[in-house]
Structures are given as C-alpha cells and as structure tokens.
C-alpha cells in the first residue's frame, strides 16, 4: 500500500471538512432539528389539551342542556298548575256569581210574592167591603152580616 501525498492531502482535507462541518454546519442543523422536535411536541401537547378541553366542553354543554330541559319542564309544570288554579278560580267565581244571581232572583220572587199577597189582601178587603155593603143593604142584622164576612174572609 502506497501512501502518497494525495492520500494524505485528501485525509487532511476530509478532516478539515469534518471539523468545519462539526463547528459551523452541524450546530445549526442540530438546533433546527431540536426546534422542530419541540414544535412537534408542543403541537401534540396542544392537540391533547384541546381534545381534553373539547371533552370538558361537551360534558358542560350536555349538563347545561340537561339543566335547561329540567327548567323548561318545571316552567311548563308551573304554567299548567297556574292555569289549573286560574281555571278553578274562574269556576268558583262563576258558581259564586250564579249563586248570588239565584239568591237575588229568589229574594225578588219572594218580594213579588209578598207584594201579590198584599194586593190580594187589598182586593179581599175591597171585596169584603163590597159584600158587606150588599149585606147591609139586604139586611140590617149585624150578627148575620158578621157571620157572612167571617165566612168570606175564611174562604179567601
């Protein structure tokens, strides 16, 4: 094996090239690779964090939806209860008004009845007076006329 000067020159040139590369080229490449690895790790961590946040947001939205449905159901039930109460109150008021009208009508009928009785009594008195004057005209017997008047009043 002949070692000549060309081979030694190539070895020296290669060593200089390796040294130059290690000193000037390799550190920026290594730094770029490290930055790239960090960015990828950050991206993966960010994606994992976003995935967890999405799950939390889904659970929260499901809980909010469940609460909203429960509240809506409660509002509907309360509205139904209030409507039922209003309906019952309206029925009670209508019944009370009907009873009041009925009572007023009965009182009015009773007043009309009393008035009619009074008119009948007045008519009776007038008829009795007419009968009495006829009896007096027919006979002067007081006992007989009194008896006739009493019978007449009793019949009426």
Curated annotation (Swiss-Prot):
Q: Where in the cell is it found?
A: Cell inner membrane
Q: Which Pfam families match?
A: ATP-synt_B
Q: Where are the transmembrane segments?
A: 5-27
Bilayer topology term:
Single-pass membrane protein
Q: Does the keyword Ion transport apply?
A: yes
Keywords per UniProt: ATP synthesis, Cell inner membrane, Cell membrane, CF(0), Hydrogen ion transport, Ion transport, Membrane, Transmembrane, Transmembrane helix, Transport
Tell me the domain of life: Bacteria
Annotated GO MF terms: proton-transporting ATP synthase activity, rotational mechanism; proton-transporting ATPase activity, rotational mechanism
Which GO CC terms are listed, alphabetically?
Answer: plasma membrane; proton-transporting ATP synthase complex
PANTHER family given in the database record: ATP SYNTHASE SUBUNIT B (PTHR33445:SF1), ATP SYNTHASE SUBUNIT B', CHLOROPLASTIC (PTHR33445)
Protein family according to the UniProt entry = Belongs to the ATPase B chain family.
Role noted for this protein: F(1)F(0) ATP synthase produces ATP from ADP in the presence of a proton or sodium gradient. F-type ATPases consist of two structural domains, F(1) containing the extramembraneous catalytic core and F(0) containing the membrane proton channel, linked together by a central stalk and a peripheral stalk. During catalysis, ATP synthesis in the catalytic domain of F(1) is coupled via a rotary mechanism of the central stalk subunits to proton translocation. Component of the F(0) channel, it forms part of the peripheral stalk, linking F(1) to F(0).
NCBIfam families reported for this sequence? ATP_synt_b (TIGR01144), PRK05759.1-2 (NF004411)
Summary of subunit composition and partner proteins:
F-type ATPases have 2 components, F(1) - the catalytic core - and F(0) - the membrane proton channel. F(1) has five subunits: alpha(3), beta(3), gamma(1), delta(1), epsilon(1). F(0) has three main subunits: a(1), b(2) and c(10-14). The alpha and beta chains form an alternating ring which encloses part of the gamma chain. F(1) is attached to F(0) by a central stalk formed by the gamma and epsilon chains, while a peripheral stalk is formed by the delta and b chains.
The name of this protein is ATP synthase subunit b
The species is: Francisella tularensis subsp. tularensis (strain WY96-3418)
